[in-house]
Amino acid sequence: MARKYFGTDGVRGRANATLTADLALRVGMAAGLAFRRGEHRHRVVIGKDTRLSGYMIENALVAGFTSVGMDVLLLGPMPTPAVGMLTRSMRADLGVMISASHNPFDDNGIKLFGPDGFKLSDQIEHEIEELIDEDLSKKLAQPMDIGRARRVEGVHARYIEYAKRTLPRDQSFEGLRVVVDCANGAAYRVAPDALWELGAEVISMGVEPDGLNINRDVGSTSPAALSAKVREVRADVGIALDGDADRVIIVDEKGHVVDGDQIMAVVAHSFKEDGRLSRDGIVATVMSNLGLERYLKDEGLTLARTSVGDRYVLERMRSDGYNVGGEQSGHIILSDYSTTGDGLLAALQVLAVVARSERPVSEVCHRFDPLPQVLKNVRYSSGKPLEHENVQSAIADAERRLANHGRLLIRPSGTEPVIRVMGEGDDFELVEGVVDEVIEALRKVAA
């Protein structure tokens, strides 16, 4: 079904352009009506990251929810996974996170969570979309039933304690010098405090949000600053979160980046050794490196692949009973503990492995050599180039040449008229050659 407001991760857009206070007001009213079930007093928790527009959207949502009779609990700046956890913990009917994740400050978004802490299904989002466009004036609460709003104290400590409880009680990071980059985002308070409480020597960066600097040259999408800082202070490890802290990238003591694939390899091995894997495998997307798949196979584990997007990873985990999954970009989902990707929780699991091994991060977190990848795009104006006979022939020939030595992934973008062609394999020149052949065939058809 076509979507008007919701994308793959909630309602998102440029602040005060596509995502206005009026739209946020209507989202609050519509979502409140959709979850106002039964006779009990209904409540919604709202968290946000540190974007300037978060104040505007937060207040508009409060007006929307209270106008239809829902009480609002305001958390302030908190990681996305913390909002999911607190939605469950506070027995709320609904949770909301105001964030555009790793995007620049001028974007923002509204993510919704059900009472179980999971993001909403497509069906419920469709119901909310229909309500957004309705005349809701006749569904407003009576004056005596208008909701109340209040700020909740102590939520940072609750999330930190929750994060610490994912580790053994005697686990300590004493002796580890850790640089943590919070992207001037939602975790700027909780991440350094959690690491300090676990005994680490903590050096913080990206912890001075001003409403405009979220994700600006810091965080998981810009790890160069963290790499430089780790080398400068001779730290054992660096941790980079994104703006809403649902993804993480790690940097070893040499300043080398450890991506989500390597993090999943570390966690999968650790969980297997401890008997914590719910199945003999993990879930990742089609973009994860073939090197990860081969590593897991050598460990006696499988890799189940999904479409790109952490929501698809989580859907597969829930339907098939996996408890570890993620994306190369650093979304790591540990479903024994969290209902969404949680950068801090994933980092704690990796640090626990490092602390127990007493080996440098460069050894612990380099589980496999990634295969060379080549990614190229072709823009087209109309039609369906992938269905053309010449393109199909080029794809078949490319797959035949790669055979068991690599793989080819071709997918249209979900947001623009672009076809992405990704190849990977043992031989870089072969991979680049087959990708170029498919690209050339697509360009001729697209022209």
Swiss-Prot record:
Post-translational modification: Activated by phosphorylation.
Cofactor note: Binds 1 Mg(2+) ion per subunit.
Active site positions, chain numbering: S101 (phosphoserine intermediate)
A Pfam family recorded for this sequence: PGM_PMM_III
Cofactor(s) listed: Mg(2+)
Domain of life: Bacteria
An example molecular function term from Gene Ontology annotations: magnesium ion binding
CDD domains: GlmM
Residues engaged in binding Mg(2+): S101, D242, D244, D246
Modified residues (Phosphoserine): S101
EC number assigned by the record: 5.4.2.10
GO biological process: carbohydrate metabolic process; peptidoglycan biosynthetic process; UDP-N-acetylglucosamine biosynthetic process
Keywords, in A-Z order: Isomerase, Magnesium, Metal-binding, Phosphoprotein
TM region positions: none
Alphabetized PANTHER family for the sequence: PHOSPHOGLUCOMUTASE (ALPHA-D-GLUCOSE-1,6-BISPHOSPHATE-DEPENDENT), PHOSPHOHEXOSE MUTASE
Cited function: Catalyzes the conversion of glucosamine-6-phosphate to glucosamine-1-phosphate.
Protein name as it appears in the record: Phosphoglucosamine mutase
Gene: glmM
